[in-house]
Amino acid sequence: MGFHIYEIKARQIIDSRGNPTVEADVILEDGTYGRAAVPSGASTGINEAVELRDGDKSVYMGKGVLKAIENIKNIIAPELEGMSALNQVAIDRKMLELDGTPTKEKLGANAILAVSMATAKAAAKYLGLRPYQYLGAYKANILPTPMCNIINGGAHSDNSVDFQEFMIMPIGAKTFSEAIRMAAEVFHTLKGILSGKGYATSVGDEGGFAPNLKSNEEACEVIIEAIKKAGYEPGKDIAIALDPATSELYDPKTKKYVLKWSTKEELTSEQMVEYWAKWVEKYPIISIEDGMAEEDWDGWKKLTDKIGNKIQLVGDDLFVTNTSFLKKGIEMGVANSILIKVNQIGTLTETFEAVEMAKKAGYTAIVSHRSGETEDTTIADLVVALGTGQIKTGSLSRTDRIAKYNQLIRIEEELETTAEYHGKSVFYSIKQK
């Protein structure tokens, strides 16, 4: 029939930070093939699926992925060869069975995910479909509102800003292409403003600027200045989204949040909640990701009770794209949104299950890149297939980020009049003003 898996190849390639990562090719009997490369994160959740690294310090500083490659060639490939590529669930379940650990530490989530994504791409190609059409069927027509990273701090930079990502969301755009234009205009305007203030305009891992600003507040203020100067209204045309990555600031021993890159101030959970409540009043913020640490479930509950009806509260390190943690969050009434990172969980099937659970509970879902990316654009197709309406894939610079935006522009063009861009209405988990 031609749609059975004939061969699986795997290789070590380089990601956007110069570290090795896994790429896999799934080749079908008729010669059709799908190729996928996996990303990796800088700030990682303690409960994330395990990214298998070789640990040999004399090669790639211990970050080689040859063990994961060997696992694909020697363990995964012999079991999957001969299976139908059109049965994604069976393929993914077989790999989970072969691994047999909760965090995929035996075979490596990087090995499993590369094969999972490559299989879907091969199946789509075999059927003459785009990956978004194959994975999303008739529902795949919603283009996402992008979260564009424009200022980096914390673990993603070398400056005195505590919070990892300051992003803009073009919520007032009518189409995805217009959203990208608006974001790009603000990005270039911000560059001019930073340069005029004597700040460096070099970019961080995800393509945002990493200037040595004087405070966390200054980051919000220069972004608002850039939005206005570019001709847009903050909060109406373009809103701010944050990823403070507070797990990086949290000391589990003292249960305090330490603003270690700026004032060295120590805040209790209650004080951190008040901090965010003030910021939401002061700035046009629509979304905060990881506003509290992944171990601080009580703090998360307080934050959700305080501002969860005003803005989107996204669990990333908290949920690690895992249905068991998401279930706990839903039961406790913690957060109202989940960040979806395919490599945090390791298969497309589990990713779909997490999004399904979130939607049923009234939580939003955001498909996300990682700080170590490649030219692979699978997540662009995935966000349209899942219909989550939001994507987080970096700034308006660096090809590893732009590749995803360009793929979405192509998808929007291909969908023609059926393409929808929902802008602000994607935030169904909060009260709309």
Curated annotation (Swiss-Prot):
Cell inner membrane keyword on record: no
Amino-acid positions noted as binding (2R)-2-phosphoglycerate in the UniProt annotation, renumbered to this chain: 164, 341, 370-371, 392
Protein task: Catalyzes the reversible conversion of 2-phosphoglycerate (2-PG) into phosphoenolpyruvate (PEP). It is essential for the degradation of carbohydrates via glycolysis.
Annotated Mg(2+) binding sites: 243, 289, 316
Pathway involvement of the protein, from the record: Carbohydrate degradation; glycolysis; pyruvate from D-glyceraldehyde 3-phosphate: step 4/5
Enzyme Commission number(s) of this protein: 4.2.1.11
SMART domains, sorted: Enolase_C (SM01192), Enolase_N (SM01193)
Group of enzyme by EC: lyase
The family this protein is said to belong to: Belongs to the enolase family.
Lineage: Bacteria, Pseudomonadati, Spirochaetota, Spirochaetia, Spirochaetales
Species annotation: Borreliella burgdorferi (strain ZS7) (Borrelia burgdorferi)
Gene Ontology cellular component annotations, sorted alphabetically: cell surface; extracellular region; phosphopyruvate hydratase complex
Protein name as annotated: Enolase
Superkingdom: Bacteria
Cofactors (names): Mg(2+)
Catalytic activity entry: (2R)-2-phosphoglycerate = phosphoenolpyruvate + H2O
